[in-house]
C-alpha cells in the first residue's frame, strides 16, 4: 500500500475528527489516481473493486517492535516529543490489538466503525469513473463490500454509497451506474442470503475465508501443523483450500445461490479465491449455476480451459 498504508493508519488512530479528516483528504487523490489508472487500463471491461478488507493489524505499526522501542527509550531515560508520541501510539495500538485479527475489525466492520473510510473510497471510485466518462471512455465499475454477515451492514454501506455517488454525479454532470454487491465469506451470510440479496446487485463467494470460517481453521496455522496428518489419516483427500469442500463449504455456496436467486432472479453470482483456478472446483461451480470464477493471473489459462470444458459437459 505504500504511502496509503501510513495514511490509513492515521485515519484509524486519529484522536480528533480534524486529524482523521486531514488524513482522509490526503488519501483521496491517491485512491482516485489508483482507480483512474485501473479503469483506464480496463476501459470498456468490467472491474469489481472490493472496499478495504485486510485485518486491522495490517494498517498499524508492529506492536512488538513499538513496545521494544518504548521500553528501550525508557530504560535509557530518554525524554522528548518523540518518546511521548511513541508512548501514545503504543497505547492506541494496544487498545486496538486483536487476538484473532482475521475474525476481528476488518472488512465491512472496519468501514462502519471508522468514519469516512469507505466513504472516501467510494468517492474516489465515483470521481475516477466520472472523469473517464468525461474523457469519452466507458468505465464499467462495480463496488464489492467484504465480510458482510448481516443485511443491515450492507444496507448501511449501500445507502452511503448511493448518496456519495449521487453527489459526485451531480457535481460532474454525468450519469453513474455502479452496481453494489457483497462477498459471501461467512456461514451466516450464506444462510441468510435470501435477506442479503435484497440489498445486493451481485454475490461473490470468497471461498478462501468461507473455508476458514466453515471449518474453523486458521489457514496460516493448520497447513503447517494439521494438514499432513489429516491427509495421512484420511480426514482429507485433498486440502479444502485447494479444491472446494463440496459437502460443507460447497453446500453453503449452493444454499446461498438458491436462496439469493429466490429473492432476486438473475442475481449475478461468482467466485473469488484460489478455488476459482482449480479444475475440480470450477466444475462444481458450473453445476451450482454460478456465472463466473476469478483467479490469480497465473491460474487464468487453467480457469478458462476448465470453464470451457464444464460448459460443454
Language model region names:
Residues 1-313:
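Conserved alpha/beta-domain cores
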